[in-house]
Amino acid sequence: MPIDRMPSRRSVLKLGAASAALAAPFIRTARAAEPLGFATWSATVDQVKAHLAAFEKKTGIATAYSNSPFAQYRETMITKFTGGAPVDMLWVSDAWLPEFAQAGWIEPIDRFKQLTAYDAVTSDFCNASTMFEGKQYGLTYYTDYMGFLYNAEILAKAGFTTPPTTWEEVTAQAAAIKAKGLLDYPVVIGMAQESWMIEFISTLVFSHGGRLVDDAGDTVMQEAKTEAALQWLVDAVQKHKVLSPGCVQTGELEVLKTASAGRAAFVLLPKYRLRALNDPQQSQVAGQFKQAMMPMGANGAHATVGWMRFYAMTPHALATAERGENTAKLMEWFGGKADGDYRFQKTILKDLALGFGIKALYDDPDVRRDLNSYGDADLMARQQDLAHKKDTIAPWFGEWSDTNGTAWQQALLGKVTPAQALKTSAAKWSDLKRAG
């Protein structure tokens, strides 16, 4: 899922201080006997309810479950926090971590060693995505990464028996497909100003060996490896004409629809979309799409971007030691093992193709059977090992993203050079970081 817009740091901190003051009396009076409040957005609802029922039966601990649509979820939770609502555990997007942590709406879980023990068996980018200022704030709910998917039948018609391994080879194969009249625009990448745009951009940058922001939060997006990523994209549109200039109006869902209709040879899409592409009820080209390792740039690797959503704990959960331990049990039941098995992770994979952070699940017979029914479990695991968290997660992301997206689009349309576009983006990031 995409990164989400956030307010400025100043507004977050002001609201966080206010919410802490308002909620404090309620938190102090919370009792361990009260049901544990668990809030989510409206996804996997039936699966959550069934797993909660099993938890209550197993532990005797009562829970109170609520959910709201994703589009309103963040605002709904802020209202709950400022009103002192009895929420103990909730889903949080990796994009919101700085905001929620700085505001004091969620608490680190480092004290619960039974929870942090799962770090050793979890994908590195998932662990990194729950860390803020040296503290860990949760366990993985689900995760995924941007995959490089290709139509094997179209490649075969063009005379290719293997997919490209570099972005240069992507260009060459796409040009051959175009020359044979198989497709006008064999490459389909969404570069519309929508929430998925940062995932597409990050994937191209990481696979070229670049970054947008360094570990200190300073911009490096103006450097050569990042420029090489944008230059490849610009050349695909302007020079080789294998990617439509209409990509600036193409969102992630349109990429999926185009691929499903057989009008794409190479696409960037979230890995979980592979199941839909190979489902005869959803796709005209079922059985034709495969996943390959992300192509790499001249100075890059087969890297991609990953994202995750996690279970977090609130100050309300820590009102008493017993309540904290009970909330930790609930978090482990969902984000770790339940009765000795990763039951919830396997359920949402089977039912909804939602990915997992536990690396050992790629060796689970049931999981492998499911993944291999529409893809390649071993390749999926190898690619996940090379996924990196987004490096642009910051309270000012939303303000920067508009400028960055426009700059990349202007470069794609030939209005500015890649270097000029990245200089504009870098300057905006630096200005926002200084302003805080």
Residues covered by each model-derived region:
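N-terminal secretory signal peptides
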Residues: M1-S11, A18-A21, P25
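Hinge/lid segment of periplasmic solute-binding proteins
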Residues: D94-M146, E169-T171, M197-F200, A286-A292, ...
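Short, solvent-exposed loop/beta-turn-alpha elements that line the ligand-binding surface or hinge
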Residues: K80, D110-S123, V187, M191, ...
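Glycine-centered hinge/linker elements that transmit conformational signals in sensory
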Residues: A174-A175, A216-C247
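C-terminal lobe and pocket-closing loops
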Residues: Y272-Q284, A298-T403, R434
